[in-house]
C-alpha cells in the first residue's frame, strides 16, 4: 500500500472510531483490502450496526460522513450499511463470502 493509501485508510479508521456507535464494526473490502488497488480505485466499506433494520436516519448519520470524507480527499468512498442480523441473512451470497474472506476490520 502506498503512503497515500495508508493515510486514507487511517483517516477512515479515525472517522469510524469517532462517529460509529460502540458496538458497530467497520470493514474495508475490495481492491483496497486486497492491496491490489490502482491509484483511481474506490474505497469499499461495510458498516455493521446493532438493531433490527437500517433506517434512512442511519444512512444519513453513519454513511454520509464517509462519503463526505472521500469528497474532501478526492477519492470515492462507498460505504454499505447493514444491521448484524441483516448481514447474517446474506451468508449465502457471494458478496458476504468475499467480504468475510478479504475484509479488513478497521474498527
Where are these regions (language model features)?
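Catalytic core of pol beta-like nucleotidyltransferases
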Residues: 1-27, 33-39, 49-107
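Short beta-strand->loop micro-motif that forms the acidic, two-metal-ion catalytic signature
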Residues: 44-48
Amino acid at each position: 500500500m502506498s503512503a497515500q493509501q495508508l493515510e486514507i485508510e487511517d483517516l477512515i479508521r479515525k472517522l469510524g472510531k469517532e462517529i460509529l456507535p460502540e458496538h458497530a464494526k467497520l470493514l474495508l473490502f475490495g481492491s483496497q483490502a486486497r492491496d491490489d488497488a490502482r491509484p483511481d480505485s474506490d474505497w469499499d466499506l461495510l458498516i455493521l450496526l446493532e438493531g433490527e433494520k437500517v433506517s434512512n436516519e442511519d444512512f444519513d448519520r453513519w454513511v454520509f460522513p464517509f462519503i463526505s470524507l472521500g469528497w474532501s480527499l478526492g477519492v470515492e468512498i462507498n460505504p454499505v450499511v447493514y444491521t448484524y442480523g441483516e448481514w447474517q441473512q446474506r451468508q449465502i451470497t457471494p458478496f458476504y463470502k468475499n467480504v468475510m474472506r478479504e475484509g479488513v476490520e478497521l474498527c
